[in-house]
Amino acid sequence: MFSKREWAILIGLVVLVLVVYAGLLLVMTRGGIGAGAVASQPTPPWEVLTAQEAYPLAEEVARAWQPDAKLSIASSSWRSGATPQELLEGKTTWGFHFISPSASQSCIVSVVGGEARVIESGSIPKVPVLLELSDWQVDSPQALSIFLDHGGRDFLAAHADADVHLHLLTRIENETLIWLAIGLSSKDGVAHTVPINAVTGAVVEIQS
């Protein structure tokens, strides 16, 4: 269970992730960054994958970037107007944030249309301790189903403009792999957040 202080830290991390993911979407929309030729993107509708389907593609690219690359965060979003059925499929484009402990570097790997590539990399001042993914059992469709069943469906019905953000967090201070599912209404400035144990599927409680 999270204390209120730990919960505040998590929310701060998610705000950072949202900024990174917004940058990821901008890069994907503009076709990439960096020197040299930029690979063309598939023409929609492209193949969309769940988190566990997309991860092996991202991991292969990340390990080519740095052999000891480990996943820090996996992120994706569904824009307002997505139906519950679309959410329950749990399939979309993904951004995976990897960290190389030996090189003190991080990179973002995008997976779009079944294609993975590094879109950004750089140094980091501090290397966090990350959990292994061997116990990762709950895929994105299950995480979104849990979100909908724990207030998410009612929240989206009340806030038609809300986007849904889904983040897999692997930092050891969380004690286990955590899915953070967030419905966010920019119009009303409100959010509905459901933290989910990505190993057991249980909703994580917050201690008072």
Give residue ranges: language-model regions.
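Long, terminal "pre-/pro-" and other extracytoplasmic accessory regions
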Residues: 2-208
